[in-house]
Amino acid sequence: MPSGSKSKKKKSKSKGGVKKHAVEKVAPPIEAEIMDERDESDYPTSRVIKRGPNGDVIVESLPDKSTSGKKSKKKGKLSDLEVSESAKQMGITLDSHWESLSPDEKKNILRIEKEEVLEIIRNYQNDHNCSCSVCGRRHMAMNQEMERMYNLLYELEEQRDPDMNPVKFHLGIIKELQISKNKQILDQTEGPNDNTTHEEVVKNFLSSDIADKLKEEVHQFKQKQLSKQECNRPSSLANDNIEEEIPCAQIPQANEEAMTKDIQKTLEQLSVVEPVSKINVIQEDDLGEIKEENKEYLKFTESFISSQPKIAQKFIQKLDENPCMKAITDEVMQNSSYEFLDALKNLWAPNLLKIVESEDDDNLVNLNETLDPIEFTTMLHHGNPLSQQDYYDLQGAISRKVVNAFNFENRKLEHLSPLEVELFGRFMSSDQDNIFHNMLLEAYNERFKEEPFKMMSNIPQIIKAVATLTNLDGRMMDDVDENHFTSEEERYDDDITDYSDSEYEDYDSEYDDIDNGDIISDVDEPFSTLKSDQLRVNYDTNSGNINHSDNYESNSRLREVTDENEENLQYDTPQEKYNYSDHGKDHGTIADEDEDSIDEGYESSIDDMERLEEGRRLIQIAITKLLQGRIMESYHEKEADSNRLKLLKELEEEQMKKKEKEVKKIKKKEKEKEKRRLQQLAKEEEKRKKEEEERSAREEQERREMERREAQRKKVEEAKRKKDEERRRKLEEQRKREEQQEKQRKAKEEQKRKREEEKKKKEELERQLREEELMKKKEEEERLLREKERAEILKKETELAMSMKENHSSQSLSIQNQFFSNPQNSNIGMQNYFNNDLDNTNAGLGNGGPTNLGVRKNSHVLGLTQVYSDKANNSPGKNDDNNEINNEILNIINAATTAKSGSRTSMDMQALLQPPFTDNVNDQIRSSNLINDQASGMNSNGLSTNFHSPYGSNVFSGENQLSNNLQNDILTGLNADTSSTNLASWTSLPALNNLNANQHILSNNQTPLHQQKGTSPISNTMMDTKRDYLGDELSKLTTMLTTNSLNESPAFSSSNLQSSLWNDQNSSGKTPLGSNTTQIPLSQPAFLGTEPPVHRSSIWGDSSASMFNFSQRLSVPTNSNSVSSQTVPNQNIGMGSSFTNPSIWSTGSDFNVPSRDMNSGVAFTNSFSNTSPRNQFALNSGSMLQNQSQRQNIMDNIRLLSNSPQNNGYIPIDLLYQSINKQSTSDFPSFLNNVIDLERSHNYDLVKDQTGVINGVRVGSENRPVSTAFSNFHQNMDPTMKGPEHLSNSIPGTARNFEGNSYLAKEATMNIIPSSSLDR
């Protein structure tokens, strides 16, 4: 590997702008200088070719004047000893290289074909002659002549040897050259020594006679051709100038004849090696040949195609399959595309000389100076010469630019500037063209390294493109033989492998006597005269291409020898030279004359034998040139491979060093990292220990603090516990003292209460005596009046009984239709009917007795229904009579209601169990002020004894009594007309019946209740404790009133009845008079399996005591007017058997209580004669439809008042009641019932205070639809009310007539007693 490769690599890296494959820096070669004393020489060339005495070609160099001054500046001469030593060393190197070649490689080198020899001769002629038509014909003649001579020689050899073939023929010619060389060596050993001979040769070469002779010949040539010359000798001048411009060592002046002989001897020796080597190759195994061949292809593939083994193997397989590819690859491997360089050289060299117009030596000197690229680059660099490295870099850049600028599609060079074209021409014409050629080859191979088969075929196109771009003369393009650059497939159509090894068997005996040592010595001798610089080979380490810069002189010397031989053969006489050089730009009409003169001279001067000998020598020169190129190429390839392997090895070593260095760096980094990690771990461990110590100290401090706090907390708790114990002790003592004081206070209060109770009992007894006397008088008067009315009604019933039997069916249907078509008229008629029935029934009781009660009652119902039905349809006069009767009954009821409208206390409820009042008492109450008259109508608590709530309690009682204005409003509502108010809620049929029953009992001289006080007196304890429970009773009473509803059927619950709010729980479940005294709700059958507890009739005392008191009162023996318990059964009654009537007309007790507990055998049952559903319907049917109007009136007032901004949705109850009374008179209980019902049906909110009293109404969410009076009529009706079965036994057909009216009676009965009042 050259010493400058590493430095070149480093410099190319530092610059960065140069590619890897740039030409390495080459040291300037040592040049020899030859001093020429003949300055007057006018010969335009740098050499003289002539024949020696023995017929050998002699070449004499004549350095030009213009170049002598430059060369004098070069370094000193090389000594002859050094040249000889280098030649010997090169010979030894080539000998060892030849021995190292494989048999196949030797065979390929020695295999020479006829066409190859002729091709070399033709190419030489084309390269060194002009392209005119005359020369073209001359070339054709020469080619034909050379081929004829070759064939003649081959025929002569074939006559000697019948088995002659082209290869054997060529080897024989080389053998002749070897024999002549050996003979010449023997002659030289017998003559003078080498030094004296060499001096003589140099002296003869530099003699003035030879130079004068050549000068005269040149002057004669110029004088004869001055007027005719149109073209110069571009080939000769170009070659001469190029050689002179090359900055290489000049060829030493030596004996040219001896040098020629040496070259011939070398070629002969090289030609002999092939058969000897081949003999050894034949004996080897064929498998080894295949392997060696594959190895060579593998190396080539890895170098030029791809370094990957898989791709290389595939390429080798393709070569085996395609012979054409294999042939092309072999050509590329052997020639390395030197044709490309030669073509470019031949293209540019003539073009550079076309500017020459004169043939003076001064012009040639000026031309050479102008074409010098160094001076041109110095001029471009502002007079500063470029360094050698910069000069080489510029050449590499221009070479790559030219190759890369070639476009293979349009066959043109693109993107080249004029300066680049000028530099390219100057580099091609310089004496360093081999260096530039190598750069071009390198750039060319680099571009086509992926497609190596396109390399040779593209060379002609690139050359044409360069010629077109630089405007070359068209004649110069004719010199480019494209056939020379055709694909290797056409050049190797005849496969060289057709020759078998048997071809060389004939030569074995012929060359057996040749010793290997002789061959080596023969090979060494011809190269002994060459300098080491001429044979040194440099390689581009990056691309693997051969650099021929240093061995250019050897190639030039061999080429000169060849040229001289050819010229001597062609121009033995001056006339021939004159004829050849007599060319110009325009041959004109003398072309034919020149041709004739050439032919005449040729025939006259040389005979056939001499011409044949010259042809043999020319063939020897061609074969020598071919072998020389092959051997040198093989040597260069091997050196390139070795250098490449060395480079790869160095690269691998460098890579290994880099890797080792990187590994060391990585290990060092890892060690540092590990060290830092250990340090970090140590720091973390130290920090952790420190934190652990701090944490333990902190925990210890916290533990001590907790202990201290715990001790302090225990002390505080102990002190607190002692204080608490002391405080509890004091509180216990204080509580005991207070209990003792409380006991003493209660004892005093109990004594005081007992005294007050005794006083009240005494006053009460006195008051009751007075009331009994008044009631007795009133009852007597009423009884007489009822007996009179009853007698009249009985008479009418008897007359109507027969007519009703006949018209039973039609009358029943008529009654039902009229009732549902006009409910108001029907209600009036029914009301009148029941009013009359009340008097008739009472009269019947007074006259008839219990036997005819049932008949009278049934006939009364049927007759009265028929009468009112007929009156409504036919007789207006009778309707007037009935209206008078109805008005009388209503007056009586209004009088009774007005008399009993006052408020009373809870103590007065016991008075309701006594016999009823008389008319005188009622008159007295009606005529007096009910609020202020406390002397006759008030008890000791200031409450009226006459007004009783229909719910069994006082509405306006208690210490928190309502104002006088509100009481007056209530009394005013109670005195209103029954036709416009809900009278049934305050006066009911049972009340009237109880009134009549009580009058009947009094009329039969029954003992009053106040006369039986000794037997069952009122408990003094109950009278004493009434004040304590007065507030609770009022709150419970208010809650009961707010939940009443008149339109819903009563739903009694045994649990509600048992949990009484007004009496003791111990007495709530007792039956005062026996087990049969049970309560049954109106909505259930009369006879049930269960026996609910008795509903209390008193809110103050024990229910058992009051019931016992009442039973004693009922158990008094009666006269014949008394009615037995079997006269009217319980199942025919609309009420329950043990229902407590809350009406103000009743005594507050049950009316169906048997007397079994009293053992009297007689029960008080006459009240049932007046409590039938017909009587109830008569009083309530008129007010059923009016409830709807009252509710609608309330709703309208609520809406009106709620829209007022000052009310904001809230309406006080007293304001609402006053607003209602302005439009229609209504009593306050009925008003409350309607408000409560609207609260349920229309989602109104009732505002109550803490005691449950209703204070106002607040409008709620969207109202629900209002339920009608007949919505749940049939479902809630008592089974005993669904039909008058009790009437069917006495009067046939009455049940069907009464069916429609019984429903209305049921609804009226349900509206009389609200369910909520009973539940509470």
Curated annotation (Swiss-Prot):
Compartments reported by the entry: Cytoplasm
Signal sequence, start to end: none
Entry keyword set: Coiled coil, Cytoplasm, Stress response
Positions of region (Disordered): 1-85, 541-598, 656-766, 1048-1073
Keyword Isomerase: no
Main location class: cytoplasm
Tree of life domain: Eukaryota
Keyword Metal-binding part of the UniProt annotation: no
Protein name according to UniProt: Stress response protein NST1
Gene coding for it: NST1
Coiled-coil stretches noted in the UniProt entry, renumbered to this chain: 637-807
Source organism: Candida glabrata (strain ATCC 2001 / BCRC 20586 / JCM 3761 / NBRC 0622 / NRRL Y-65 / CBS 138)
UniProt biased composition (Basic residues): 1-22
Pfam families noted in UniProt: NST1 (PF13945)
Membership in a protein family: Belongs to the NST1 family.
Cellular component GO terms held in the UniProt record: microtubule cytoskeleton; P-body
Function: May act as a negative regulator of salt tolerance.
